[in-house]
């Protein structure tokens, strides 16, 4: 830690989902990580102890609700309750990856809206603010009745690709839902966009990938918010090459990379996969064509600005 933050009432706590990111954020802010322990009883119940006074402090909890999702959610809820009962002044949840975000609406009858339920649980536990990164659905902000700052990963990804000095690029959205995200990256890189339109011509027939936009002879950059099993992104990359793209890069904010994702990426035409560290990944998933960027500086700056009651809006771009 190279600098010391002046206000001792700012406390940053780490739980178990991403301790390396939490330590990086604390170092950038200029504070020591708050003293707490997260353990399990013999039956698996979560036990949290806060090992310093936080009375009257502004507390920030760094916790991605990634795999194991439900374990990390329970840790977070119990930590919020512990801070509330210890008389914290404010309890700010920093969620680099918001689990259950894809369950943001009723796609079919009798389905839950679990993204809303999670928001309710955080508020009921005692959270006073949320700092989130690249929510799968922006409308999740409306699920909260407390302030929420929604940061974007596109500037981080865009800065990386600017530094590569790639020529004749095109930004590609792998589906209709990601067009806005692709447009933001395209505007930053001053590049055109293309869209992959997946259609099933008739029942029981495989989907056909139609590419809307010119990708012939260009370097394509696929962008998504989440790469989970990597089926969509790898099929899209293969379709781009088959239709004349010179080479394909892929990027996302949240590398869930579950199931066959790593194998699919290794077997695909993707030259490089660029992600952030919003989710902690085991070493076996850090494959050769994998580049991980840090969201630590962005989240640290957001924490400082929230604590000092400064504007956070410029971080959105």
Swiss-Prot record:
Q: List the disulfide bonds.
A: none
Q: Report which gene this protein is encoded by.
A: prs
Instruction: Kindly list the positions annotated as binding D-ribose 5-phosphate.
Output: 200, 224, 228-232
Q: Which residues bind Mg(2+) 2?
A: 175
**Task performed by this protein:** Involved in the biosynthesis of the central metabolite phospho-alpha-D-ribosyl-1-pyrophosphate (PRPP) via the transfer of pyrophosphoryl group from ATP to 1-hydroxyl of ribose-5-phosphate (Rib-5-P).
Query: Can you name this protein?
Result: Ribose-phosphate pyrophosphokinase
Species of provenance:
Bacillus subtilis (strain 168)
Q: Which cofactor does it need?
A: Mg(2+)
Q: In which pathway does it act?
A: Metabolic intermediate biosynthesis; 5-phospho-alpha-D-ribose 1-diphosphate biosynthesis; 5-phospho-alpha-D-ribose 1-diphosphate from D-ribose 5-phosphate (route I): step 1/1
> What's the miscellaneous note?
This enzyme uses a steady state ordered mechanism, where Mg(2+) binds first, followed by Mg-ATP and lastly, ribose 5-phosphate.
In the record, the effect of residue 204 to A is given as: 4.5-fold decrease in the affinity binding for ATP. Slight decrease of the Vmax value
Q: Which residues bind Mg(2+) 1?
A: 136
Q: Where can this protein be found?
A: Cytoplasm
Which residues are recorded as binding ATP? 43-45, 102-103
Name the residues that span the membrane.
Answer: none
